[in-house]
């Protein structure tokens, strides 16, 4: 699995108007929750984090991922291609998936379902909750990924031959966060431990602040949620 990650200082600019500097901390927590879910998905052999952010790189290694250095101001599709090349260099050719790193409500069982369904298609994708963007892109080989992330990427991936995998619009794998409205939507459904801890730390008034998604509660102390969130806010 390839997970491209922007530098936290540059990420989630559309959240800045409503949330100010908190957006940087949120981007950090989103990444950690997404990575945790990916690492705990059955069938995922290798995770490659593509990033120029030193904190993201350090924490990715701590959580068992490989790290591929990225350009300081990366293009998302270039980052995905870099990650796919890294996958080819460290293991046998095989299925690959690229995910956006802003899925704080992602559940391992959702990703497992998608990866299982993707085995039946040369290329496949999951649209975001709007039906316009893409949160997951898969291919049976690393060289076949052909990413086209960006505006209207769901249409572009379809036009390039990728099969759309149908998932409920309110499941975590489709709930990427770009706007305050997106944040409220995923918070109502439930977020992972890092984002939940940040909500508590910031006393954010979201229902998920005291109610992380099912399956995440048991890992909070083991993964050092509080210290990770404190690092994000420092």
Report each predicted region and the residues it spans.
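Short, glycine-/small-residue-rich phosphate/pyrophosphate-handling segment
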Residues: 135-162
């Amino acid at each position: 699995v390839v997970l491209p990650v922007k530098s936290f200082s540059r990420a989630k600019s559309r959240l800045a108007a409503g949330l100010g500097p908190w957006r940087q901390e949120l981007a950090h927590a989103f990444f950690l929750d997404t990575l945790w879910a990916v690492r705990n998905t059955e069938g995922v052999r290798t995770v490659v984090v593509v990033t120029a952010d030193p904190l993201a790189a350090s924490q990715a290694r701590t959580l068992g991922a490989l790290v591929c250095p990225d350009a300081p101001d990366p293009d998302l599709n270039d980052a995905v291609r870099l990650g796919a090349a890294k996958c080819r260099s460290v293991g046998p050719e095989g299925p690959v998936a690229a995910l956006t790193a802003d899925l704080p409500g992602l559940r391992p069982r959702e990703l497992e379902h998608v990866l299982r369904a993707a085995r039946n298609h040369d290329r496949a994708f999951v649209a975001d909750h709007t039906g316009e963007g893409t949160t997951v892109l898969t291919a049976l080989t690393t060289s076949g990924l052909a990413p086209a992330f960006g505006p209207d990427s769901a249409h572009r991936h379809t036009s390039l031959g990728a099969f759309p995998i149908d998932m409920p619009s309110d499941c975590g794998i489709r709930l990427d966060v770009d706007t305050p409205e997106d944040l409220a939507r995923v918070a109502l459904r439930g977020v992972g431990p890092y984002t939940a801890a940040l909500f508590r730390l910031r006393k954010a008034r979201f229902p998920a602040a005291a109610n992380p998604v099912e399956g995440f509660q048991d890992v909070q102390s083991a993964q050092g949620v509080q210290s990770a969130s404190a690092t994000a806010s420092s």
